[in-house]
Amino acid sequence: MDFISLYRLNLRFINAGGKAKYLLRLPSLSKIQKLLKKNQEIIVNRKHDTIYICGLGPSLADVDLDIVADKEADTLVVNHFFKMAEQTKLRPTYYLMADTGFMKCKHIAAFNKAIEMYKDSTFVWNTSFLKINPEVLDYDCKKIFIATSNGYYISPKKIDITKVMPAFGNVICAAIAFAIGAGYKKIVLLGCDFNSFAFPHEIHCYDGGKENKAARRISLDFELFCYSFDASVHVQLAEYAKSLGIDIINSTRGSLIDAYP
């Protein structure tokens, strides 16, 4: 068996595991579906056709986000963007945090900090948060939920944010999927370097970029292995967006994502 066959087999195993998880969660799906139906309001009330998605790659440190803030467009940021607050006046339309790690003790402070600093943004959270901490439903902030547990996004298929969707890989894949599902016609990527596997230390826009010497939390080989699947999801998302007439433009300088122009 060659490497390509092994790679495709891995994708099938991941997808099968996700489908099994989805079936196991069916008994509790009714509560989730009520939350997801509320996302229809996002689609109906969307004010602009363009959205800027800001990753946290080192290149974002060189972007004047104040210019983005002044554009007639919506914005979406992710994860630890709050650490960039002192560098920009940007108040994002959406703040996506999908990793259940944010519900763990060592990360909950960061989660709460983001909520405290961006009260005027709409937070987009994973429904899996509710299993770990049901109280997030009552947090004092604007929030919606997405569910990404129905298999893996291994081929272009309909994206519907009012229903349980497949898993999309890393947070930027999920952000793009959300933007497509919300009905945006033009999606612009900033700070989506997609290159952390190419450095011996962790790199982000908020902690020194390429000069940062923070210790890695996972090995280079495992991160590259994971990125191979994320790269595949980007290709599928690009094909799906194209079929809908949606433009995805990667404006990240030096980005290693090759799925978008």
Positions of PLM-derived features:
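Metal-ion/cofactor- or nucleotide/acyl-coenzyme-handling active-site neighborhoods
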Residues: 2-261
